[in-house]
Design a protein with these regions (language model features):
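A general structural motif
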Residues: 43-49, 70-75, 119-128
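Short acidic, glycine/serine/threonine-rich loops at helix termini
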Residues: 2-4, 34-38, 78, 102-105, ...
Length: 171
């Protein structure tokens, strides 16, 4: 339908961008795969990775990989090192607040991420982190709470994806 509108308007050429490659790292000792049938009281299903992948896929992104780590500095750092080799945008979910086992901010700093901001004045979503790695990689630290992660994705990550794909700030 969009192609028909362009042709009807006499437009024969359009500029298009490409969608970025997205890496998602979910963190948490409590996380287990959704296909595990036995769940203990201290565990929860790793729903954030799949939720964010589905949201990114819905707008047309194709290269989206998910990794899961424990609340462990070396595991988080290892996954980040792997993803920064190919990803244009990296989402690290959980472990970004002020808890005793929240290592994401420190791991990102040690991994060479330039922090642009940490914490925003919204609820849900307060512990949001944003930084950059190198020339072209954007890094978001999203809260582990699913509703907070969803809100932060739509308010902050989605606009970043669309702008990288060529959308204007106004749209």
């Amino acid at each position: 339908s969009a192609l028909g509108a362009l042709i009807a308007g006499g437009i024969s050429e359009v500029s298009v961008g490409s969608f970025p490659n997205i890496g998602i790292i979910t963190t948490g000792d409590e996380l287990i795969s959704f296909d595990q049938k036995q769940i203990k009281l201290h565990q929860s299903y790793d729903s954030n990775g799949l939720m964010l992948k589905a949201a990114a896929s819905k707008i047309g992104l194709e290269k989206i990989d998910i990794a899961r780590t424990k609340d462990d500095m070396s595991e988080i750092s290892k996954e980040f090192r792997e993803m920064k080799k190919w990803a244009d945008i990296i989402l690290v979910v959980g472990g970004i607040s002020l808890g005793e086992r929240d290592y994401v901010k420190e791991a990102l700093t040690k991994g060479g991420v330039n922090e642009i901001f940490w914490r925003v004045r919204i609820k849900p979503g307060k512990p949001l982190y944003y930084g950059s790695y190198g020339e072209n990689c954007q890094v978001f630290g999203l809260p582990g709470n699913s509703v907070s992660a969803f809100v932060c994705f739509h308010l902050f990550v989605l606009p970043a994806i669309l702008m990288r794909a060529g959308a204007s700030e106004e749209s």
